[in-house]
């Protein structure tokens, strides 16, 4: 009698763990406004603050093992450099390279004591911005007033949603998932601007709220707006030197900035 011996080979699959190190980027846009159709858009122009901002984030990136990139050439070329940041949604290759991208205005200062924002906010599902107390504490009845709802762009957004989500757009973190979720709304930037005559910050708030993307409120100290008034400078992680005073040579914060960042070359010319 023939006997058949069946040999069964057992393959043990051991999952390979890829040690993926998260790559995080800090990005700023500082482009010659004269390359755009509206160089005086929103009264924004070149100023000395950008050198301190750039230098502070270069040091911050080195300290925390991050990457820093400063964009100096137009891509979208729409109205003014402030609209260039929407390329972070429109160009998908950004997230072939990075897990998270933080946009910062060129008048935001990374304070020397600031911790690693990406370590504290590692969720890859959400769009993140600093809690802005002015909007969080605004009565619901005031959310849709003209000064916060220019030309009715937020008419379809509930007052509660506005109070929970609305943010100041000088600092935010974008991830691949949040960018993909928001993309159909971001693509409309020219049409929405044409319809409502809104600024880029209002448009971004609209895109976040209208899209329903997962939103994460970061601590308010990641974007502390300051026009030179006296505050406890040990509290802010990122100091946002907003407003027109920074265009004046006597702006009170320049003395402090020189102490915090003594290696900034004051002779470095500001582009016009």
Q: Which ranges hold each PLM region?
A:
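Short, flexible, basic/aromatic active-site loop/helix in glycosyltransferases
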Residues: 148-163
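A conserved donor-nucleotide-binding helix/loop in the catalytic core
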Residues: 76-104, 110-119, 127, 167, ...
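Long, low-complexity C-terminal extensions of enzymes
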Residues: 258-272
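Catalytic core and acceptor-binding pocket of nucleotide-sugar-dependent glycosyltransferases
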Residues: 162-254
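N-terminal anchoring/stem segment of glycosyltransferases
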Residues: 19-98, 211, 242-246, 264-268
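Short, positively charged and aromatic/hydrophobic N-terminal segments
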Residues: 4-18
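Conserved donor-nucleotide/metal-binding helix-loop-beta segment in metal-dependent transferases, i.e.
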Residues: 112-149
């Amino acid at each position: 009698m023939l006997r058949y011996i069946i040999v069964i080979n057992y393959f043990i699959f051991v999952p390979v763990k890829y040690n993926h190190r998260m790559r995080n980027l800090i990005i700023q846009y500082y482009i010659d406004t004269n390359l755009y159709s509206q160089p005086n858009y929103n009264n924004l122009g070149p100023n000395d603050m950008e050198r301190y901002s750039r230098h502070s984030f270069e040091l911050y990136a080195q300290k925390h093992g991050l990457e820093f990139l400063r964009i100096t050439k137009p891509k979208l070329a729409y109205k003014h450099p402030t609209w260039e940041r929407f390329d972070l949604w429109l160009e998908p290759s950004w997230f072939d390279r990075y897990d998270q991208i933080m946009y910062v205005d060129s008048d935001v200062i990374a304070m020397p004591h600031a911790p690693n924002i990406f370590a504290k906010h590692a969720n890859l599902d959400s769009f993140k911005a600093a809690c802005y107390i002015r909007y969080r504490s605004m009565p619901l009845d005031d959310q849709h007033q003209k000064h916060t709802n220019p030309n009715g762009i937020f008419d379809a957004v509930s007052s509660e949603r506005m109070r929970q989500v609305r943010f100041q757009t000088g600092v935010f973190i974008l991830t691949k998932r949040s960018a993909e979720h928001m993309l159909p709304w971001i693509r409309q930037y020219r049409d929405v601007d044409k319809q409502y005559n809104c600024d880029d910050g209002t448009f971004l708030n609209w895109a976040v709220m209208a899209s329903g993307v997962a939103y994460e409120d970061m601590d308010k100290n990641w974007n502390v707006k300051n026009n030179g008034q006296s505050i406890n400078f040990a509290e802010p992680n990122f100091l946002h030197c907003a407003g027109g005073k920074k265009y004046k040579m006597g702006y009170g914060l320049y003395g402090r900035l020189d102490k915090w960042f003594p290696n900034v070359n004051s002779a470095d010319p500001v582009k016009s």
